[in-house]
From Swiss-Prot:
Gene Ontology MF terms in the entry: cholesterol monooxygenase (side-chain-cleaving) activity; heme binding; iron ion binding
Species for this entry: Rattus norvegicus
Gene: Cyp11a1
Subunit annotation: Interacts with FDX1/adrenodoxin.
Pathway field: Lipid metabolism; C21-steroid hormone metabolism; Steroid metabolism; cholesterol metabolism
Name the UniProt record assigns to this protein: Cholesterol side-chain cleavage enzyme, mitochondrial
Membrane topology: Peripheral membrane protein
Amino acid sequence: MLAKGLCLRSVLVKSCQPFLSPVWQGPGLATGNGAGISSTNSPRSFNEIPSPGDNGWINLYHFLRENGTHRIHYHHMQNFQKYGPIYREKLGNMESVYILDPKDAATLFSCEGPNPERYLVPPWVAYHQYYQRPIGVLFKSSDAWRKDRIVLNQEVMAPDSIKNFVPLLEGVAQDFIKVLHRRIKQQNSGKFSGDISDDLFRFAFESITSVVFGERLGMLEEIVDPESQRFIDAVYQMFHTSVPMLNMPPDLFRLFRTKTWKDHAAAWDVIFSKADEYTQNFYWDLRQKRDFSKYPGVLYSLLGGNKLPFKNIQANITEMLAGGVDTTSMTLQWNLYEMAHNLKVQEMLRAEVLAARRQAQGDMAKMVQLVPLLKASIKETLRLHPISVTLQRYIVNDLVLRNYKIPAKTLVQVASYAMGRESSFFPNPNKFDPTRWLEKSQNTTHFRYLGFGWGVRQCLGRRIAELEMTIFLINVLENFRIEVQSIRDVGTKFNLILMPEKPIFFNFQPLKQDLGSTMPRKGDTV
């Protein structure tokens, strides 16, 4: 594994001299040709950006030989150590410029224009084009993207909409607590020990469908609908089978009828068929209803708004469902993992949650506003374990970064994983320390938190995910002490999103009943 045993220093270079503060113990950084900031007035050419070479196929051969496919985040770190804070790399026929300094990221995003373009996953595009599937904001661009995005923002990003999600997500989180208590009862050992990744997938799917449709699918019941489980499995398979086709033309995989392509297409087929079935069923159910005593969900609001054609609504609902399972569940698993490794931090978070419960008198909508450290722990988790290892933009106009002129239409990628592990931006970067995000200094946080992207093209489900994770963690911290069975690092692998290299086995120890008695629920007297 590249990160283990890789002895590196800070990659930020000034006047071609490495900083003295090491990120990892070991040999110093090779500055590379032009790795520093040039003092000349005119920018240097694109070809002068440090690079492993211009033959993309030779580069790809070495990349694959080193098993870089599932360790691309470590590959980025290694290249920054070799070439400095900016480099370009061509793998196959795709060339990118990579940066990691938050100031460079700020420059990039400030020039992205009103309709930013980002990298589209090639096998996803190939599937949608070949099977002529409808597309939503994930794949759209220019005015078509903007029209859909403006409408969707009103339903899933606006504060007035977000508050409607609280009771829905609180109910799902409480049912997850019941799942853990069932596991404890089944093991009959006073605690639950095991891998909860499948339960987290079901929790995430139940959460996103609850928000979208305003009703529950029952994914946290003892008996789970096998068809709904098929959707969850398909999302995982879709991510997993994407990786081999990132650097080779997906059409080759399709023409040669490879298992990778067949599995990938089959996964998307299930995603579309199930999402369409859910949407159609809830659409007809909603048409029969007249009295809504609770928020009826995003789908109902979109249909009632008459601002998007039904086919556009279907496409965007499909993308929201597909994007709301593995991403959120993985972040929660990493957060639990970090809390279990850092029990003092866990106790600080629990104390904040209990104080918030008392102050809010059990009102979850108020509670989520009273847990800044808990929210910071989510930021800290995404710093160490970002869902996406890079954020990408195709630049609209020529752009100068670190005194190199980058031509328009070039793909520039902000290496979020490498940035999060860089000591120049995050002192003691391997330490899980949520308090670092509570500092008010712009120098501490400016463009350092990019867990959900940035700007108008940031993650559409950001507010849902943040609220979902906050409510989940509140409930878990109130009810359980979380530990891990092994203190050894599980490592990470790239399956389009970052995942643990091996299963994480947790211990969930119920807190004493007298502790729970100090936690009033909404409506309780205090």
